[in-house]
């Protein structure tokens, strides 16, 4: 996933750099 999903889908920051 791409974009900023804080708390969603297990992403802490941008899913690009920090995937679940």
From Swiss-Prot:
- Asked if Disulfide bond is a keyword of the record, the answer is yes
Q: One GO term of the cellular component aspect?
A: extracellular region
Q: Where in the cell is it found?
A: Secreted
This chain's function reads: Beta toxins bind voltage-independently at site-4 of sodium channels (Nav) and shift the voltage of activation toward more negative potentials thereby affecting sodium channel activation and promoting spontaneous and repetitive firing.
Q: What is known of its domains?
A: Has the structural arrangement of an alpha-helix connected to antiparallel beta-sheets by disulfide bonds (CS-alpha/beta).
Predominant localisation class: secreted
Q: Which GO terms describe its molecular function?
A: ion channel inhibitor activity; sodium channel regulator activity; toxin activity
Q: Tell me which tissues or organs this protein is expressed in.
A: Expressed by the venom gland.
Presence of the UniProt keyword Metal-binding in the record? no
Segment forming the signal sequence: none
User: What InterPro entries does the database record attribute to this sequence?
Assistant: LCN-type_CS_alpha_beta_dom (IPR044062)
Residue intervals of the LCN-type CS-alpha/beta domain: 1-20
State the family named in the UniProt similarity comment for this chain.
Answer: Belongs to the long (4 C-C) scorpion toxin superfamily. Sodium channel inhibitor family. Beta subfamily.
Identify the species of origin.
Answer: Tityus pachyurus (Colombian scorpion)
Record keywords:
Amidation, Disulfide bond, Ion channel impairing toxin, Neurotoxin, Secreted, Toxin, Voltage-gated sodium channel impairing toxin
Cite the PROSITE patterns for this sequence.
Answer: LCN_CSAB (PS51863)
Q: What name has this protein been given in UniProt?
A: Toxin TpF21-Cocle
């Amino acid at each position: 996933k791409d974009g900023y999903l804080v708390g969603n889908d297990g992403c802490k920051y941008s899913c690009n750099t920090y995937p679940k």
